[in-house]
Amino acid sequence: MSKADFIFKKNIKKILTDGVWSEQARPKYKNGKTANSKYITGAFAEYDLAKGEFPITTLRPIAIKSAIKEVFWIYQDQTNELAILNDKYGVRYWNDWEVKQTGTIGERYGAIVKKHDIMNKILKQLEENPWNRRNVISLWDYEAFEKTEGLLPCAFQIMFDVRRVKGEIYLDATLTQRSNDMLVAHHINAMQYVALQMMIAKHFGWKVGKFFYFVNNLHIYDNQFEQAEELLRREPVVCQPHLVLNVPNKTNFFDIKPEDFELLDYEPVKPQLKFDLAI
């Protein structure tokens, strides 16, 4: 069993047995019913990417291609415009969060990256002093939240650090997430930020190191318990999924494309499970 599958099953069991019920929940299902959930707090996982440990489950198929395209929308295009995500990348799942027919998700994610010129600043800091301890991407912007409506960022902060081991520089990353739909989005969010970590490492010709993942509120919605039990019954596939970025070292961050990524040795259990999302 891969490390990701072990952690996935452990967290599902913990939420079902030890989780508590949400109160005054904000999300709604499409039928208008309040989307309550059982949740745990303070979930943490560590993956050593350099040793082939990647945060993707084999217990159900994960839409890794569309997930990675979202990273490009946020950190390369640096926009909140849904038309770009729809037309350039063919990704439409964000459309449910459109703000009042504006064609955007509000001043969130990519708009915040552009507003603060975050990517150029991070790359400049790492170039000038890789060992500085201030490499923080934060999408939490109270001014933007007051200015426009929209879903507040779930994965809102990632920090980077480097280590020199036997002459090689490794880039580590720590993702902090305020809220996470365990069954639907956990591995999508994790792999998105692994992809970002890989892009930055490749920009400098470094190796990818460790990926640390902290979720403050990890939950399973009340319409997902049947799927949760099915996932616990499934036997994981014996394989070692790993993401590769097929570009030369020191390829500029902004020249990397979604199709440069390839997920190898990934044979998830089928059929896919269906979920009614909470909006």
Swiss-Prot record:
It comes from the Bacteria. The active site is at C154. Keywords: Cytoplasm, Methyltransferase, Nucleotide biosynthesis, Transferase. DUMP binds at R133, R134, R178, S179, N180, D181, N189, H219, I220, Y221. PROSITE patterns: THYMIDYLATE_SYNTHASE (PS00091). Pathway: Pyrimidine metabolism; dTTP biosynthesis. (6R)-5,10-methylene-5,6,7,8-tetrahydrofolate binds at D181, A278. GO terms for biological process: dTMP biosynthetic process; dTTP biosynthetic process; methylation. HAMAP family: Thymidy_synth_bact (MF_00008). NCBIfam families: PRK01827.1-1. Homodimer. Catalyzes the reductive methylation of 2'-deoxyuridine-5'-monophosphate (dUMP) to 2'-deoxythymidine-5'-monophosphate (dTMP) while utilizing 5,10-methylenetetrahydrofolate (mTHF) as the methyl donor and reductant in the reaction, yielding dihydrofolate (DHF) as a by-product. This enzymatic reaction provides an intracellular de novo source of dTMP, an essential precursor for DNA biosynthesis. This is Thymidylate synthase.
